[in-house]
């Protein structure tokens, strides 16, 4: 049985991150180069809808087509943490550049690529902040933060961190 379902059923007020929504928007955690909805790939809509309603039962969500969770696990949307990236994975900009070919296509102008990146970032964050769940944004995502070659904070050398210890 899904651990999120057990926690939410037994402990009122306990929340969990929604991997269904994250992966439905940007692609699977296990493959940085595979895109999903933000890359224009169809098939992840139910996972995104499940995230937007806050992982609760909803008549317009077909649970058989949701990525991981096959039944609602939240009893209230505030138990659902909506996000597309966090500290233990690529930040959103880096993930988009790795999984959306048009963002690195040098035959397109830099202005076009930047505008497209901004549109995709806005679309992703719109899903997060307008969902019924609790929105979570990695610091700097609103400014198109990048970690460049380091996929997680734990892989980044201390010398490359600011004096506050953040990236």
Give the positions of each predicted feature:
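Conserved alpha/beta catalytic core and glycan-binding cleft of carbohydrate-active enzymes
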Residues: 1-159, 165
């Amino acid at each position: 049985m899904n651990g999120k379902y057990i926690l939410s059923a037994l402990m009122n007020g306990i929340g969990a991150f929604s991997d269904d929504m994250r992966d439905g928007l940007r692609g699977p955690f296990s493959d940085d180069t595979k895109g999903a909805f933000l890359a224009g790939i169809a098939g992840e809509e139910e996972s995104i809808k499940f995230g937007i309603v806050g992982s609760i039962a909803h008549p317009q969500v077909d649970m058989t087509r949701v990525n991981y969770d096959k039944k609602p696990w939240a009893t209230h949307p505030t138990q659902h943490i909506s996000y597309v990236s966090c500290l233990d994975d690529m930040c959103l900009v880096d993930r988009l550049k790795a999984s959306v070919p048009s963002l690195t296509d040098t035959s397109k102008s830099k202005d076009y690529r930047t505008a497209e990146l901004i549109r995709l970032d806005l679309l992703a964050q719109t899903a997060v902040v307008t969902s019924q769940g609790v929105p979570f944004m990695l610091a700097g995502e609103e400014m198109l933060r990048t970690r460049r070659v380091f996929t997680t904070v734990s892989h980044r050398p201390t010398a490359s961190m600011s004096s506050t210890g953040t990236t």
